[in-house]
Curated annotation (Swiss-Prot):
Full protein name: Probable chemoreceptor glutamine deamidase CheD
Keyword Hydrolase applies: yes
The organism of origin for this protein: Rhizobium leguminosarum bv. trifolii (strain WSM2304)
Family matches, as InterPro entries: CheD-like_sf, Chemorcpt_Glu_NH3ase_CheD, Cytotoxic_necrot_fac-like_cat
A Pfam family that the UniProt record links to this protein: CheD
Domain of life: Bacteria
One GO MF term: protein-glutamine glutaminase activity
Function: Probably deamidates glutamine residues to glutamate on methyl-accepting chemotaxis receptors (MCPs), playing an important role in chemotaxis.
Catalyzed chemical reaction(s): L-glutaminyl-[protein] + H2O = L-glutamyl-[protein] + NH4(+)
EC number(s) stated in the UniProt entry for this protein: 3.5.1.44
């Protein structure tokens, strides 16, 4: 086995997932209110990680239609990716990270993300063997998909705010300005 410093690093960004069977690879991501699900089959020696922004699906009326932002889509992709590479559903185990409350608003998207991930895995019959969710600071996450080892580092307030800026949905484009005026 390679030393920790020599591990092949694969960074996961929002809306992505990766499945690997390389014992010398480590998956990493930076999380604010987003959640990362880390799943593996310990017998097959394969695992993966996803990184989603919002719970639910892109079919809801307020979603904006980008499926890669949503937990339902990325959870299904991760599970199916593991199964395609030889994992068995009955051997999968999960760890959940992220879901911080990084923006003080009325709704806590981070909490909703974490609750969604836990409920999704419960519904799928996949045990959650570890989790670290909530709080008010982001985290850097590392996950070794073959061994199942995970490590997180808390982010400072400034690092969390930079992460939040990356997670926020871009503003809708401005509506075109009317060139004519009608008086009544």
């Amino acid at each position: 086995m390679m030393t920790e410093g020599a591990a092949r690093r694969v960074h996961i960004i929002q809306g992505e997932y990766k499945v690997l069977s390389d014992p010398n690879a480590v998956l990493s991501t930076i999380l604010g209110s987003c959640v990362a699900a880390c799943l593996r089959d310990p017998v097959a020696g394969i695992g993966g990680m996803n990184h989603f922004l919002l719970p639910g699906s892109a079919t809801s009326p307020t979603s904006g239609g980008d499926a890669t932002r949503y937990g339902v889509h990325l959870m299904e992709l991760l599970i199916n990716g593991l199964l395609k590479q030889g994992a068995r559903r009955d051997r999968l185990e999960a760890k959940i990270f992220g879901g911080a409350k990084t923006i003080s608003t009325f709704s806590n998207v981070g909490e909703q993300n974490a609750a969604f991930a836990m409920q999704f895995l419960r519904d799928e019959g996949i045990p959650v063997v570890g989790s670290s969710t909530g709080g008010d600071h982001g985290r850097k996450l590392e996950f070794w998909p073959v061994s199942g080892r995970a490590r997180q580092y808390p982010l400072t307030g400034a690092e969390t705010q930079r992460t939040v800026a990356l997670e926020q949905r871009p503003a809708a484009p401005p509506k075109p300005v009317e060139t004519s005026i009608e008086f009544f």
